[in-house]
Curated annotation (Swiss-Prot):
Name of the protein in its database record: Large ribosomal subunit protein bL27
Coiled coil stretches, renumbered: none
Lineage of the organism: Bacteria, Bacillati, Chloroflexota, Chloroflexia, Chloroflexales
Organism: Roseiflexus sp. (strain RS-1)
Region (Disordered): 1-26
Gene Ontology process terms (BP): translation
Length: 85
């Protein structure tokens, strides 16, 4: 016999809001300083040249330029922004 009454549906019904993670500006796109490039949990993608890393691991542009994604090692991606003349 059950010690507790079956109350499945009334105890469920919680869900968190979407966090809108992912790449916001892709390789080859032009960005301004402060433009968010990637929103992520942890450093799945590492910061490269001319980008900053926020407290929540958001990668953002520090200069005006073009976004490039680089394969740094076999299992590490890096994103940089390079100025265009």
């Amino acid at each position: 016999m059950a010690h507790k009454k079956g109350v499945g549906s009334s105890r469920n019904g919680r869900d968190s809001n979407p966090k809108m993670l992912g790449v916001k500006r892709f390789g080859g796109e032009r960005v301004q300083p402060g433009t968010i490039i990637v929103r992520q949990r942890g450093t799945k993608i590492k910061p490269g040249n001319n980008v900053g890393l926020g407290r929540d691991y958001t990668i953002y542009s520090l200069i005006e330029g073009v976004v490039t994604f680089e394969q740094h090692s076999r299992n590490q991606k890096r994103v940089s922004v390079y100025a265009t003349e």
